Amino acid sequence: MPRHAHLLSALLLVAVPALPALAADRITGQPFATRSEVHAPHAMAATSHPLATQIALDTMKAGGSAVDAAIAANAALGLMEPTGNGIGGDLFAIVWDPKTKRLYGYDGSGRSPHSLTLAEFQRRGLTDIPSHGPLPVTVPGAVDGWFALHGRFGKRAMAENLAPTIRYAREGHPVHEVIAYYWDRSVPRLGKWPGFTEQFTIDGRAPRNGETWRNPNLANTLQAIADGGRDAFYKGDIARTIGDYFAANDGFLSYEDLAAHTGNWVEPVSTTYRGVELWELPPSGQGIAALQILNLLEPYDLESYGFGSPEHVHLFVEAKKLAFADRARWYADPAFHPAPVERLISKDYARERGALISMDTALREVQPGTPKQLDEGDTIYLTTADADGMMVSLIQSNYRGMGSGMAPPGLGFILQDRGEQFVLREDHPNGYAPGKRPFHTIIPAFATKDGEPWLSFGVMGGAMQPQGHVQILINMLDFGMNLQEAGDAPRIQHDGSTEPTGQNTAMTDGGEVDLETGFPYETVRALMQKGHSVRFSHGPYGGYQAIMKNPHGGWTGASESRKDGQAAGY
């Protein structure tokens, strides 16, 4: 650990009092700031922006389904929070349909350009795919996802769902604090890419907190989609503009790549934990890491250890290390490298891997398991629920903040840089190939009890996402927190595991444990004695939204303070 990190830890050991002392001045009994859950009898929405939440509610009040509301809110977030998402990115969703009483999963991720080969990266002397510019760009799948979800579950016309965002894009809306912060950080990194400064700055700078932002180009693009449907984006003038732009700027994404795009309906997969069944989408995303971590934690009595105890943090971190070793080895596009999903999320496999966990010593090096096939496999998150009982868990992203920085002229959005997550090796499951989906970090979550819907939730934020999913559930199921407290509680994030992107070498030092402010000094000392390298950092620790089915009727919502968001209902 760097010397300054040791000094910071030492200072915090003195400055941070124990949990019981902190709890004394809060009526909730919790040692951290929180607020009330939100309850409503008919419908609920929770998003990372208050205006998007209101748009979702207005959509359902006008007769739209939870899917209509999710699409309307996602469109709004693409305008209002371009630091995390937009129609240049991908989309994943899980929908609970009250008519069929089952879950439906959608993988709306795009593929790499067919004309960009591994040999081209090698010709350029690259060992990693750049974070920005034309090379990491993959086909954006979000708009396709909207229309796929709408075609199965929508009630209102797509034009009605997009109308509020089109109006805000033309007339303007005030930029919120967290978004302004990340926007300001993005401008110096992305300003050199063609079209970014012209379309995403005000006189060369980011819009400030409270300042009005307009995006008439995006309004025109959304209007074209509203009028022409899905094909207006993938097979019309929008696709031609994108193809021409990349051809003129050393890029490879083409009209043909966009025209060939298809998303996929997929079956969610699950595991059980303390009487609850957690559902995630299968790879190429990382959702099953949350299932693996829960399976590894299940044998331990976390409730008796208590939230924030050394045992709680240690066990969570060790389980994460084991799951993420498999994540680096197995998670990839199943069309190219199918993962042994059923085995990876099985209880038997968790028992085998769990034998590596010691209560006394932190693992420093973790190899992936060798699961054999069983006989016979920056981001925004939002959730909505309607009066009919439909629930939507939806996540959408540009990948790294504002994406690649590549902003085709006149369109008002930025293309994602998801291709950065490929490995430039043929022998790796996540190795680059034309027409392939990269490993994905964005994952929606859903939980059921006794076959009935219970909780739609998500925690955006890269590798934090499966770690966040697990922490929300154990906060509720093991530590007795309510829906809002579960998201507001201080978080743990372990960094340093081997990555499926190939950008981290194999972990040999145990990685680093980042703790958000609020963990007691006794815990920090005990973790360090076990061999953990502990840091207190500003994060990010993700962004949480959730809706729970209220057992007394109606809905309960939550939205945490780490984002600009809001949960509201009617």
Where on the chain are the PLM-derived regions?
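Bacterial N-terminal signal peptides that target proteins for export
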Residues: 1-9
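Alpha-helical support elements that line or immediately flank enzyme active sites
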Residues: 59-60, 144-152, 228-235, 240, ...
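Short, small/polar residue-rich loop motifs at catalytic or cofactor-binding pockets
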Residues: 265, 376-379, 440-442
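Internal maturation/activation junctions in enzymes
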Residues: 299-398, 410-411, 418, 538
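Active-site rim segments in enzyme catalytic domains, especially the processed small/beta chain
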Residues: 79-83, 89-104, 252-254, 390-455, ...
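Extended C-terminal subregions enriched in glycine
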Residues: 388, 436, 469, 478-539
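Bacterial N-terminal signal peptides
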Residues: 9-20
